[in-house]
A protein has these predicted regions:
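Gly/Thr-rich phosphate-binding beta-strand-loop-beta motif of the actin/hexokinase/Hsp70
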Residues: 1-33, 64-69, 168-181
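Cytosolic/nucleoplasmic/matrix-facing N-terminal domains/tails
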Residues: 3, 48-58, 74-75, 131
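Amphipathic alpha-helical transducer elements in NTP-driven molecular machines
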Residues: 10, 46-53, 91, 138
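Short, glycine- and charge-enriched coil/turn segments that flank and shape catalytic ligand pockets
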Residues: 21-22, 38-47, 117-125, 169-176
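Switch/connector loops and helix/strand junctions flanking conserved nucleotide-binding motifs
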Residues: 24, 40-42, 75-79
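N-terminal phosphate-binding loop and adjacent alpha-helix
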Residues: 28-58
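Active-site neighborhood for divalent-cation/phosphate handling
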Residues: 65, 69-170
Length: 181
């Protein structure tokens, strides 16, 4: 089993999904207030956040692996089109495009990308989703996770996690337009 963990500005939330008869099922969850531990840009009390996380975990589960959620407002993301002929140099091209597209020095960022298959209308290019986060925002969350004796196996944007969950739990509606609030 793996835990999904969201460290927000006012709440700490986690869920655990595990294999069910046919699909993954919700096995456990917790929501805990973290008042005055974090505001929009500043961490106020990491040790208190770790204590809250450990307390909720020990009460309900022994799961150690987690997928860490990061809010979209802390991430700069951009869709880019890249010619198929550039595939062999993709890492270099992504670094150049990140430098041009993101208003922070690359040394201050963690960034990653995901390649998507070409759109039907343009088979010569493929789409790439580039995502970058300032190290300070992710490092503080990773510090909390490590101090709580959890192992982060992935970091995912909030919006991408919601879309992925929708596709998993409602595959028959995959091509319908949806709005998530």
């Amino acid at each position: 089993d793996t835990m999904g963990l969201d460290i927000g500005s006012a709440m700490l939330k986690w869920v655990i999904f595990g294999p069910g008869d046919v699909y993954y099922e919700l096995k456990n969850y917790a929501i805990a207030a973290i008042p005055q531990c974090l505001d929009y840009k500043q961490v106020k009390d990491v040790s208190r956040m770790v204590a809250i996380l450990k307390r909720t975990l020990l009460e309900k589960t022994r799961v150690k692996n987690c997928v860490l959620n990061i809010p979209d407002h802390l991430v700069c993301s951009k869709w880019i089109q890249i010619d198929h002929s550039a595939y062999e140099n993709l890492d270099e091209i992504i670094a150049i495009l990140a430098e041009q597209s993101i208003p922070y020095p690359l040394k201050d960022l963690y960034f990653d990308y995901q390649r998507f298959y070409p759109a039907q209308q343009n088979q010569d290019n493929f789409k790439v989703l580039l995502a970058a986060c300032r190290k300070e925002h992710l490092d503080f969350r990773l510090d909390i996770v490590h101090q709580a004796n959890l192992t982060p196996i992935a970091v995912e944007l909030s919006s991408q996690a919601i879309v992925r969950a929708n596709y998993y739990f409602y595959p028959e509606n995959r091509y319908e337009n949806r709005m998530f609030l």
